[in-house]
């Protein structure tokens, strides 16, 4: 169960995601890194009262990471036997839970076609390791997330993308962001929160102009910044949570300039 829920001034984002979920449609959440896509998936899991099994994609993702693997175990009689340990895809299918595939476009294109039957009307998979045919139990749903244009991402296969309905998830701002900061961080100082929100607006503008990376303007970075601002000067909090993560000196300087303007 999540302690906090997804919030957005555009209420249709969550409403539409919930409606698609109830129609058993595959949902693809598309938006910048740190915009709350995983929080939206967690909130759906909470609202629908269904556990969520997560796959974190990378170029190293393989079939075993998705489906599971064979291993040797000792049974009750003390004999060793080969057993198959279900991975997140098969667990979610068998138990009628949610499968959440994070950063799906980080995976190599040749890794994902094995999910085609899972993602279409069949909701079915043949386990290549055991030959077992698995049909998804009622309640099974698929949510995936994509960070377009992010370093390391690959163009998403059109046949795969066509199996999803896309929902754009943008950064939150204004009063909604203020509420999120107060609920999810230790910072309660109204004036400082307003300064942080204005600072974040400047970061987002620089992100859109290509001056800094998306991660610098992410909601999770903002929550960390707000927490640290309760125990150290705001300038040092920004240094620790945002600037020190960046390698490019020009990006670092751009954020230092934004600090001078806002604090």
Curated annotation (Swiss-Prot):
The keyword ATP-binding applies. GO terms for molecular function: ATP binding; ATP hydrolysis activity. The keyword ATP-binding applies. InterPro entries: AAA+_ATPase, ATPase_dyneun-rel_AAA, CbbQ/NirQ/NorQ/GpvN, CbbQ_C, ClpA/B, P-loop_NTPase. Pfam families: AAA_5, CbbQ_C. Transmembrane segments: none annotated. This is Uncharacterized protein SERP0979. It comes from Staphylococcus epidermidis (strain ATCC 35984 / DSM 28319 / BCRC 17069 / CCUG 31568 / BM 3577 / RP62A). ATP binds at residues 31-38. Belongs to the CbbQ/NirQ/NorQ/GpvN family. Keywords: ATP-binding, Nucleotide-binding. Disulfide bonds: none annotated.
